[in-house]
Amino acid sequence: MKIIYIDLDGVIADFDKGKNNHPLGNITPYIGRPDKLPGIYENLDPIEESIESVVKLLNHSEFDVYFLSTAPWDNPDAWTHKRLWIVKHFDEKLIKKRLILCHHKQLLIGDYLVDDRRFNGASEFIGEWIHFGSEKFPKWKSVLNYLKVQ
């Protein structure tokens, strides 16, 4: 069974839309640090086709799927909100105890990491980094095709 880690922000949760719509987004302490916005992670919309695609992976017999995200150190509520977000959007039977919050993604052992950014160890991940949003993997359909999941 192959292990797949899937980032949350920018991969299945639309962080960019959320920060642009947040009522405090233009206030000085948060400019350039949208991850510190209070409640930023609570009500993010899912990225198009992300929920359906992740459910396909969760139900696929060849993959062991985990959510792997970094939560801002200075925004401890974000740690809880990320968990609540996945419970809101996925059947808890499929995702229970499958959330890993980590600032050093390169330390985890796995086959694939689906992540939109190279930070927090994503680009040094020992398995294969599937760079979501890149030319090769612009949308979830391209990720599923690459993993040979229908």
Task: Describe the predicted segments one by one.
Residues 1-3, 63-64, 109-111, 127:
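Short coil/turn segments at beta-strand junctions that form active-site/ligand-binding loops
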Residues 75-150:
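C-terminal cap/substrate-recognition subdomain and adjoining C-terminal extension
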Residues 41-46, 90-93:
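Short, flexible loop segments at the rims of nucleotide/cofactor-binding pockets, characterized by
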Residues 1-44:
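Active-site neighborhood of HAD-like aspartate-dependent phosphohydrolases
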Residues 45, 50-80, 86:
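Substrate-recognition element of Asp-dependent hydrolases with the DxDx(T/V) motif
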